[in-house]
């Protein structure tokens, strides 16, 4: 483990609301706060548009699941490459929304999520949110059963 002089790992979550537009602020925040792991939501870019080189220039390695124009999640780690474990929330092979990414980093399993909004009540988006939450609950139970250091974070 390379994180922190005390062996502690600092994990943060940041809804960037568009990584291209907010990249300067994200870099500033990463340099100021220096989390060991940062989970990003709403990166709002396709995979090929993710600024991995800009983040690597300040010491962060990344994995990401992009989606054009909305959604999208990423997991960054300072000085260590996150190892992808799960891309997309299990349980619905037809769900194409980029809202769940899971990785091993610094000996911890980290899941970064961007939860569906689902407003207003009674709509298809609300029903999707409820199904998504059921799937998240099922995945959380699976992760707990592993009895490994695990964190689920996001927005």
Language model features: what each stretch is:
Residues 13-19, 88-89, 127-130:
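Short, flexible loop segments at the rims of nucleotide/cofactor-binding pockets, characterized by
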Residues 19-21, 92-95, 134:
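Short gly/ser/thr-rich secondary-structure transition/capping motifs
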Residues 1-57, 61-64, 71-73:
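N-terminal, active-site-proximal structural segment of metallo-dependent hydrolase catalytic domains
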Residues 115-119, 123-127, 131:
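Membrane-anchoring alpha-helices and their flanking helix-loop junctions
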Residues 8-18, 107-119, 153:
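Active-site-proximal beta-strand elements of phosphoester/diester hydrolases
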Residues 43-46, 50-120:
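Structured beta-strand-rich core segments of catalytic domains in phosphoester-bond hydrolases
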Residues 148-155:
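Acidic/histidine-rich, metal-coordinating catalytic segments
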